[in-house]
Design a protein with these regions (language model features):
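Carbohydrate-active catalytic/glycan-binding domains of CAZyme proteins
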Residues: 1-164, 168, 173
Length: 173
């Protein structure tokens, strides 16, 4: 849930293969304001507007925040699987309007493609330093916030790979 620049409340949601959707929420009742169907613009009266994904592409965990200074909405998503070979990661896209189109730093719209590494600005991913026994993996499902001093933080989960089994943690970067 988040508020746009005009104070309207929205919910962004979606998981794995279905895509990422956006619905407006009535601030007074907390109920969905169902949009009119508009197939040409990827709007379903029940699901809302499809922002990206679908077609069995591994994308989930969306989060949108508005940056007043730039006038952009930033859409964070998690791509990939919970694997140790470069899988789960956070990528970000931006738009001047709450309902998109959300594009990456090269102005590219994230197509329905398993090649998610070709889209978005990668913020987190797996890594293991050769000198360490532990590795970070499966970073994702983030939120973000800006503190009173204007510093932005990313909150996400990850797994630490130990010799015997993975451990789940939440981090703030």
């Amino acid at each position: 849930m988040f508020y746009d620049a005009d104070g309207r409340m929205w919910m962004v949601y979606g998981s794995w293969s279905g895509g990422i959707f956006l619905l407006e929420i009535d601030k007074t009742t907390g109920l969905v304001i169902h949009p009119e169907a508009d197939e040409a613009n990827n709007v379903d009266p029940y699901y809302g507007k499809r922002l990206l994904g679908g077609g069995h592409i591994s994308i989930e965990g969306p989060y949108i925040m508005y940056d007043e200074a730039s006038g952009y909405y930033y859409l964070f998503v998690s791509y990939g699987a919970l694997t140790s070979n470069g899988g789960y990661q956070v990528r970000v896209f931006r738009s001047k309007t709450v309902d998109g189109d959300y594009v990456d730093m090269n102005g590219k719209y994230p197509e329905k493609s398993a090649q998610h590494q070709n889209f978005g600005l990668k913020l987190t991913g797996n890594y293991k330093l050769p000198s360490l026994e532990k590795a970070y993996m499966a970073t994702g499902h983030n939120s973000a916030f800006v503190d009173d001093d204007g510093r932005m933080y990313l909150v996400y989960h990850l797994s630490l790979i130990h010799i015997s089994e993975p451990t789940r943690l939440a981090l703030i970067s």
